From Swiss-Prot:
It comes from Vibrio parahaemolyticus serotype O3:K6 (strain RIMD 2210633). This is UPF0397 protein VPA1481. GO terms for cellular component: plasma membrane. The keyword Phosphoprotein does not apply. Signal peptide: none annotated. The chain crosses the membrane at residues 8-28, 41-61, 72-92, 110-130, 146-166. The lineage of its organism: Bacteria, Pseudomonadati, Pseudomonadota, Gammaproteobacteria, Vibrionales. Keywords: Cell membrane, Membrane, Transmembrane, Transmembrane helix. It is a multi-pass membrane protein. It holds the Pfam family ECF-ribofla_trS.
Amino acid sequence: MNLSAKTVVVIAIGAALYGIGGLPMFGIPVFANTTLKPAMAVLALFSVLFGPLVGFLVGFIGHWVTDLFAGWGVWLTWVLGSGIVGLIIGLFPSLTRYRLEKGDFNMKDFALFVVLALLGNVFGYGCSAFLDTILYAEPFTKVFTQLSIIAIGNTILIAIVGFFILKSVAKRNKQSRNLTEA
């Protein structure tokens, strides 16, 4: 795998923003060891703008940074889950034929964005929950309650924040595209 300097810088910035935005002081506690955090909007944005590989690495490295600085130790199962969330949301550009880059973002694209966010959260953190029960002998009901709350909460957060950000990105791309065509 050969990453360009631009891609490495984008991953570093995204991971740092995710890592900081994931700290407990910025989150809303909703269940045992479970918080809704603005970092998820950062992950979604970087995934949509730069694709699945960047999304995976921003989620994986960013969650690792959060866990390191939060002081509760690195939970690799949930670090992996965040990477998977970024990977799945990162499929958005190719599934929409890169319409966002062309300045187009319609309600069908928004619906796809929300579905990818939900699938990413369910599958990514579903893997985390499953691995927690096997590797760490965490109670099944606890981790799947965490999964349910996180999947719904993160999807709502990503949908609300993402709508406004992606509308703005589309508008900016459309304006800059019009300037180059003239």
